[in-house]
C-alpha cells in the first residue's frame, strides 16, 4: 500500500472508494480524478482488501455481504485519517445509508448515484439513466434499489456492457457507440433532456456522448468529485451542527472503536494519492 501521505495544507480531504477487491480499477479512474476533481481537494483513490475474493464479489448477491464489513472498516479508517468526504464510487450506492450513520458528524458520505441523480434533476426533470444491463427485471436487491431510486427517470435504456476481470469495459469504442444509440432514442422517444451514465465503469464516456447527442450527460464519478469539495467545506463550517446519524439503532463510539482497532490499519489493495 505504501506510506500514508501527510497533507500540510488546508485542502478538503476526499477518499474515493472503488468497492471491489483489486487495484486495477483504481488506475482506470486516475485520469478522470486528475481532470475533474475540485481544485480545493486532495483525492485518495482506494479499493477494498484483496481478501474479499477479487473484483467480482460485488456482482454476486450471495457473496456481496463480504464487501459490507470491509466498507465499514474503510469508513472507520478514513475517519481515523481525518478525511472530510468518502465517495462510494459505484452506481449501486452500496452501504451509503449505513456508512452515513457510522460517519456521523465526522465525515460526509457521498454515493455516486445519489449525486448524479441530484445533479441531473437540477438541470431537468426529464432525465434518462443509461444502464449497463437490464436491472428492471433483475431479482438482485442492489439492482432493484437502482431502479427504485431512479423511478422519476423518463427511461432506463440498456447498453449491454461487457466487463474485463477488473470490471473495466471490454470494448470502449463499441460502448461509446451503444451509449450514443440508446441516448438518442431516449431523447427522441422519451423526451429526455439529460442523460445519466448508470455505471461508474462508463467513466470517461460522458464528453464524447454529450457531443454525439447534444444534451447534458452526467458522469456519476465526475459529479461526486465536484460535489465533494463543496460538501467537505460545508462540513467543516458546520462541525458540531446537526448530526447526520439517522433515527433508529446504531453502534456506539466504543463499539465502533473496537472494530477499528481490530487491525492496525486497513489493508487497501490499492491506494493512489492525487
Swiss-Prot record:
It comes from Aspergillus ustus. GO terms for molecular function: amino-acid racemase activity. Keywords: Isomerase. This is Epimerase opaE. The record marks 90 as: Seems to be responsible for recognition and proton retrieval of D-isomers. Disruption phenotype: Abolishes the production of both oxepinamide F and oxepinamide E and leads to the accumulation of protuboxepin K. Its EC number is 5.1.-.-. InterPro entries: Asp/Glu/hydantoin_racemase, Iso_Racemase_Enz_sf. Disulfide bonds: none annotated. The keyword Isomerase applies. It is an enzyme of class 5 (isomerase). Epimerase; part of the gene cluster that mediates the biosynthesis of oxepinamides, derivatives of anthranilyl-containing tripeptides that share an oxepin ring and a fused pyrimidinone moiety. The nonribosomal peptide synthetase (NRPS) opaA assembles the quinazolinone core with D-Phe incorporation. The first adenylation domain (A1) of opaA loads and activates anthranilic acid whereas the second A domain (A2) is for activating of L-Phe, which is then converted to D-form by the E domain. Pathway: Secondary metabolite biosynthesis. Belongs to the HyuE racemase family.
Amino acid at each position: 500500500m505504501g506510506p500514508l501521505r501527510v497533507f500540510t495544507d488546508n485542502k478538503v480531504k476526499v477518499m474515493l472508494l472503488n468497492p471491489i477487491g483489486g487495484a486495477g480499477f483504481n488506475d482506470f479512474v486516475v485520469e478522470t480524478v486528475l481532470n475533474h476533481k475540485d481544485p480545493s481537494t486532495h483525492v485518495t483513490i482506494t479499493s477494498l482488501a484483496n481478501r474479499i475474493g477479487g473484483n467480482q464479489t460485488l456482482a454476486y448477491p450471495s457473496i456481496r455481504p463480504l464487501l459490507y464489513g470491509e466498507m465499514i472498516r474503510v469508513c472507520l479508517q478514513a475517519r481515523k485519517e481525518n478525511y472530510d468526504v468518502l465517495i462510494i464510487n459505484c452506481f449501486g450506492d452500496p452501504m451509503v445509508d449505513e456508512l452515513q450513520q457510522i460517519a456521523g458528524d465526522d465525515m460526509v458520505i457521498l454515493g455516486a448515484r445519489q449525486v448524479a441523480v441530484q445533479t441531473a434533476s437540477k438541470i431537468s426533470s426529464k432525465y434518462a439513466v443509461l444502464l449497463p444491463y437490464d436491472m428492471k427485471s433483475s431479482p438482485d436487491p442492489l439492482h432493484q434499489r437502482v431502479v427504485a431510486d431512479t423511478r422519476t427517470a423518463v427511461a432506463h435504456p440498456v447498453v449491454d456492457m461487457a466487463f474485463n476481470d477488473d470490471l473495466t469495459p471490454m470494448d470502449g469504442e463499441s460502448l461509446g457507440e451503444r451509449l450514443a444509440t440508446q441516448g438518442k432514442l431516449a431523447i427522441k422517444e422519451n423526451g429526455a433532456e439529460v442523460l445519466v451514465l448508470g455505471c461508474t465503469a462508463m467513466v470517461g464516456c460522458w464528453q464524447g456522448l454529450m457531443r454525439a447527442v447534444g444534451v447534458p450527460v452526467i458522469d456519476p464519478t465526475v459529479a461526486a468529485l465536484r460535489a465533494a469539495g463543496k460538501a467537505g467545506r460545508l462540513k467543516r463550517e458546520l462541525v458540531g451542527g446537526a448530526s447526520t446519524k439517522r433515527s433508529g439503532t446504531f453502534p456506539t463510539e466504543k463499539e465502533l472503536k473496537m472494530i477499528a482497532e481490530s487491525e492496525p490499519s486497513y489493508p487497501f489493495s490499492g491506494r493512489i494519492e492525487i
